[in-house]
Amino acid sequence: MASPTDRPKLRKLDRSVLNRGDEVLVVLRDPFGIAQPAAFPQEATHVLDMLDGQRTTAQVRQSLLLRGAVNLSLEDVQGLVAELSDAGFLDDDRFRSLWDTARREFMNNDVRAPRLAGVLYPEDPTALANTLNRAVPEPHDRRFAGSELIGVLSSYQPFEGRAAALLSATLQELPRPQDIDLIVMLGTDHHPGRLPFAITDKGYGTPLGDLRPEPELVAALERRLPWIRREELRHREAISLEMGAVLLHHIYGAECPPVLPVLCGQAALLTGEDEAMTDAFLATMEHVLEGRRVFWWISAELSHAGPAFGRPPLAADGVRALAERDLACIESLVAGRPEQFVARCMEADEALGKPSGAAALSTMARLLPIGYRTELIDYVTVKAVGPDAGWVGLVGMRFFQPAVIDDDE
């Protein structure tokens, strides 16, 4: 049990509220996936808010009593702190031990194992193939000789309902595998990383088979950008790239070209002096990819709003406001104006927050060839997966080579 002189510090965690009958719980989720989700009585929120690494457990209890927030004994506070520590929610030796174990396990494997199989999609290969064939039928017929398509934007929701219909409409007339040298996967990163990007030289595993990496390219990037793999562990919980990998294997199977998985974090949206790393990454990518036939796969979504994402409940007209904001952002992407897109994404909105995929989408807009053409397939809103209320803005887009201007005209 925690000592009265301990100064516990709660890690940065995702919180949500769960109503279970007459009971209200606060659910803690670790964005790094090191600790398993756990639920606590709502009264624990008062204690959680005070675990800043400055107060002892005795001082936490005293502050609660002075504020009249909740009457807990010192033993109750210490017991909750001990429970949080055991779960890996505190910034302490217990968490660092769990972190080291997860890192060793991840780094010692050549393939990034699927984390969401059996959760967001079937783990059994046959069941998964059936699910994908219903969502995106006839994958082989979606390959097209002479395709001018250079990239697609897809969501990473479960393969059903409106999300599946949007995927099927977007994934049309794709280039054949023999016409692609490399697939660059740009994925939304939900981790609180300090660096704008993280790459890996591991294959991405799926129940259907593994996507091949290109270690030589990763090594070339690391020579020029020594920090590019420093937060590689972020790939362990990369939901966006995992769902994209499943779709790519469904479409291309064993013929799938090698992939370069790139996680795009919120630091990629920083401006001014903080933009130096992003600029270096963009310039380096342009250099190392020169002459390659690259297909861009962007796994990103727009607004994530509501309690399911740790944000306030939407007002009566909240979904309409969400759609209007998302459509304004899409307008900037279609016009090929990444700076305007970022500016719109950074506008303060407490209810909606930043669009979830802003970093991946702004990176995409800067890496695609100047003058790229777009086709907006559709924009839809869907309810968040899980027990908490929330809404997600999904968009399907296709990107094409710039138009060729005939000098004789």
Question: What residue spans do the PLM features occupy?
Answer:
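Short proline/glycine-enriched turn/loop segments at secondary-structure junctions
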Residues: 381-390
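Acidic, low-complexity/disordered tracts enriched in E/D and polar residues
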Residues: 1-49
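Short hydrophobic/aromatic beta-strand or adjacent loop that forms the aromatic wall/cage
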Residues: 390-396
